[in-house]
């Protein structure tokens, strides 16, 4: 399971989501609210990941079945663990 913390702006301009989790071909959106956690799941069509600069910088592009495109980019630490900032655009 791959997890990104950050934000995502979907095509229908819903409010920002706090966390995206990729699990079993599904993309899970989680938005934390005062009354609890709101979730939304959509299927994923493709995931393309590119790591540059000897594993320090990474960029992941996720294409959903709804045609939404998500770009997660950021840096890895010395152990190669992702430290990400999530950017979303159509």
Labelled PLM ranges:
Residues 1-13, 28, 38-90:
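Acidic, Ser/Thr- and proline-rich intrinsically disordered linker/docking segments
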Residues 14-35:
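Short, compositionally biased strand/turn segments
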């Amino acid at each position: 399971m791959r997890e990104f913390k950050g934000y995502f702006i979907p095509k229908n301009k819903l409010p920002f989501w706090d966390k995206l989790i990729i699990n079993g071909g599904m993309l899970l959106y989680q938005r934390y609210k005062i009354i609890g956690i709101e979730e939304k799941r959509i299927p994923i069509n493709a995931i393309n990941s590119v790591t540059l600069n000897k594993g320090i910088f990474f960029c992941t592009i996720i294409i959903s079945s709804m045609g939404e495109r998500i770009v997660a980019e950021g840096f890895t630490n010395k152990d190669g663990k992702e430290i990400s900032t999530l950017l979303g655009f159509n």
